[in-house]
Structure formats: structure tokens, C-alpha cells
Amino acid sequence: MTNTPVTASRLVPYITARHGEQADSLSNLSLRPGSKGLFYLDEGPRDRDERGVLWARCSQSRYGNEITGRPRWREVHPSRQRECMEELRCQVCVQQSSRTALGYLFLAAQQTDVPADGWEGHLTAQPPLCLEHAKAAVEQCGHLVRAGAVTLRVRVPRLYGVIGTLYRTGPDGEPEPVEFDGESATTPLPYKQRQLTPWFLASQLVRELRGVTVVDLDDLVPAA
């Protein structure tokens, strides 16, 4: 839910990047001896996720607990997106996402080529939502308005992999990004590809949706 809204609104998702937030200098990125992948020269425990993948750093525009700055609608903030996906929190308000016996509440854009098994196994970098903000998203998110929104209840949103940048050793012995064209640039890298994950700098966490039920958002009511 990071595309430009079709109507003016104060609603800005927590995961949306803001003007003034800056990516960390790549001069802090280096290579482990023996061609064993990437690391930060001043690496800390939060720089890697639980699967050991290194994450892109980015400053945060905060005033107390409030995220400030004009939204960059088409971009997400790496650590805020990761936070919501890891903890399955609402991507707008960071509170508990909606969950019932049918599972967590996710939104997806309607597709013209939905596979035979429906949305089972769908990969998403969009964190779940609470019911209030799911309803706001289908009205305000330009991409969902144009394509049409599908409401999904998901029993098992499995950790799948990451979106980001693959690196290799450059001619000067320093990390060099591998360039990809088209959809390949945003294709998730599965965690199971352990030969590549040490060379990956992640910017979005991806889950695989299992136990999926398509529901009508208008029929959903707040949990008791």
C-alpha cells in the first residue's frame, strides 16, 4: 500500500519511506575474507535478520514516536517494512493486524492470471493490516483502486525470502552490485538459496501465503 493515493488524505502507512530519510553510505559495506559474503564494518545485532541476511540501513525521520517528512509513496522503509512483516503488524498503524480463525488479513491487487490453485502460495512484500486500515487502503491506495483489491485471510504466512540487491566481488576487491533488468530486479530471493543469501543486501521481507481464504472485506466485522 505504498502507491500514490487517489484522494488527499492524512493516512500514510508506517512502512512508507519519507523525504529526508537517507540510505547508509555503501562505504560501510565490505566483504568477508575468503569470499564469504557481505558485512558492515561497524555491524550490530539488528543488521541481520533471524536467517542471517544483511539488511540495508536507512535513517528514520522521527519526532518522538511519530514518523515525519513528506511520504515517498512508491518506496518503503527497509527497517519499518521488516518490523511489520516479522511481527505481522498492521503496515499502517503498527498495531496488531486483524486475525481470526481464518488467519491474518492481507490485501492483494487483482490479477488477470490467477493460478488454478488461487492465491495459495502467493508471495507478498506487503505486511498485513488491521481491519480499519484495510478498509481505508482499498479506498485510498491508487494501485488497489485501479487494479481492484482482493481480501485474503491467511492461516500460515510463511517467511519466504527477501527483495534487495545481490552483490559480488568487484574488480577492485570491493562489493559490487549485480545488475538485473525488468522483473528480475524485484524477484524475491528465497532464504533456501544459501549460496546467494550471504551476498544479498535486503530491503524488503517477503512472506508466502498458505492456508488462504478469499473473503469479502465488507462482510468483515471487528473482532470482539
Predicted regions and their residues:
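N-terminal alpha-helical interaction blocks
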Residues: 1-85, 153-224
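Short, flexible coil/linker segments at or flanking structured domains
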Residues: 78-81, 93, 117-118, 140
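Conserved binding-pocket/active-site segment within a compact domain
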Residues: 103-194
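Short metal-coordination and nucleic-acid-contact micro-motifs, chiefly zinc-binding Cys/His arrays
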Residues: 83-89, 123-126
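Short cysteine-rich clusters marking metal-coordination/redox-active sites
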Residues: 90-94, 130
